[in-house]
Amino acid sequence: MASRRDFFKSFVKPTKQTTEELSPRLVRPPYASGESAFQSECPSCESKACVASCDEKIIFILDDGTPSLDFSKNGCTFCDACANVCKADVLSLENSKEEKLNAMFRISIEACVAHQGVICNSCKEPCIDDAILFNGMFNPVIDENRCTGCGFCMARCPTQAIDFRILEIEGEV
């Protein structure tokens, strides 16, 4: 008889491959003024203060010198720290009317254990916006109107069944 650990592991390997194929990992920090500002201002920023300011430790710098978010361990709390330290105002509270990232999350029905009949609400528990809804005890779905793209659901999913698609940053033309 297979153990519970083996059961969960059986979902991980195919999901990792699918996740990598589905979306590039380029989610920008909150309060962004637009992709062009990242490309023109961030590479010349020497302090990279946005990285040090992030208590969740999810901001990292790409090879091109621009910041991106990594949801593998945590999500964004929209604490404003990165925007408050950005001297070039690429990240600024003035840039956004709402707390929302340029990502829309989705749950893979094939990889999600709740969709396979296992009681699991790992994604719902950390969702501060109550954007993950369950049909009964199973079948979670993400309400796109409520989801801010914070990434906590992705960080907490034991089978890595949550992925995202990149959205255009508001303000970009």
What are the language-model segments listed below?
Residues M1-V173:
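Non-ligating segments of multi-cofactor redox enzymes
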